Amino acid sequence: MLKSTVNNTRIKCGHIDQRRNYLFTTLAGTVLGSFLWSKNNVLASKMENGELHYHDPNLKFNKKLFNGKPPFERRTPDYPGHVPLYNFEKVLMFLGSSMGAFFHPEENKYIVALGESTAITPILQNLRHKMLSDPVGRTILREKPRMTSDSLNLTYLRSLPDNTIGKNYVNWLDKEHVSPDTRVAVRYIDNEELAYIYQRYRECHDFYHAITGLPIIIEGEIAVKVFEFANIGIPMSGLGALFAPLRLKSSQRQRLREIYYPWAIKNGLFSKPLINVYWEKILEKDVDEFRQEMGIQQPPDLRNMRKEYFAKKKLEKQLQGGK
């Protein structure tokens, strides 16, 4: 009987131990689950609030390399429409646009990109110095006029006397079928004032054609570019004079070499700075008087010279055919 009682007691104690282990296991699981759930909940909240960041082992190295800035991050533009470029991007733009301008000079996008990629800061700063040293140049920089069909009032210019700058200008536009509205806004030159100086040069280009009478055919463009380079110093003008003739016929190169290069260099170097001319305020001025004041002589009529050349070649062919 005593033995039976002891066995019963052991059985009861075993049941109690089993329940106790079960309770402890359940309690431990509950506490651990609550802890993990709470931790996951906190992590989820941090992720949602943007407070959780992935640890980058290269972070310290990247901060030293890029001075705390992400690579290739664009800096703040200097003016509306400005696209800041890294130096390597400027080099790539120069290489691409120079090749494009050489093989496809009729494509304005290559000419525009080449002009801005070569308009280096020291050249533009020198032009700014010239403008600041001249009362008219200072006025232009202060007022920053822009040339459009509306601002120039082409209808009014057509009503001016034939000997005026304005009438010569609008006649040249009509004859060559061009418009002042086609000039593209500067985008890739840093510094707002330097960008305006280049924009001013770009918009005045047609006036240089008008006062010299040179057409927009490639020979005329090259002659004007040499004239601009000698007077203003824009690098693209010099590059155009150097490489553009390589694609011309021998007769065209001969005309440039014997007539238009000497004229452009002489008149560009010894005339007054064209960048300081406030064209909008002298449209009613006599064009011959203006040329005399600036020290500019008109070159021979290029279109007439071409006509005479082709007429001569045609006559030679006819004479050879009659033999």
From Swiss-Prot:
Keyword tags: Lyase, Membrane, Metal-binding, Mitochondrion, Mitochondrion inner membrane, Ubiquinone biosynthesis, Zinc
UniProt cross-references to InterPro entries, sorted A to Z: Coq4, Coq4_euk
GO cellular component annotations of the record: extrinsic component of mitochondrial inner membrane; mitochondrion
Signal sequence range: none
Tagged with keyword Plastid: no
Pathway assigned to this chain's UniProt record: Cofactor biosynthesis; ubiquinone biosynthesis
A UniProt-annotated Pfam family: Coq4
Superkingdom classification of source: Eukaryota
Catalytic activity line of the entry: a 4-hydroxy-3-methoxy-5-(all-trans-polyprenyl)benzoate + H(+) = a 2-methoxy-6-(all-trans-polyprenyl)phenol + CO2
GO biological process: ubiquinone biosynthetic process
Stored PANTHER family: UBIQUINONE BIOSYNTHESIS PROTEIN, UBIQUINONE BIOSYNTHESIS PROTEIN COQ4 HOMOLOG, MITOCHONDRIAL
Function statement: Lyase that catalyzes the C1-decarboxylation of 4-hydroxy-3-methoxy-5-(all-trans-polyprenyl)benzoic acid into 2-methoxy-6-(all-trans-polyprenyl)phenol during ubiquinone biosynthesis.
Subunit structure: Component of a multi-subunit COQ enzyme complex, composed of at least COQ3, COQ4, COQ5, COQ6, COQ7 and COQ9.
Family stated for the protein in its record: Belongs to the COQ4 family.
Miscellaneous section: This protein may be expected to contain an N-terminal transit peptide but none has been predicted.
Protein name: Ubiquinone biosynthesis protein COQ4, mitochondrial
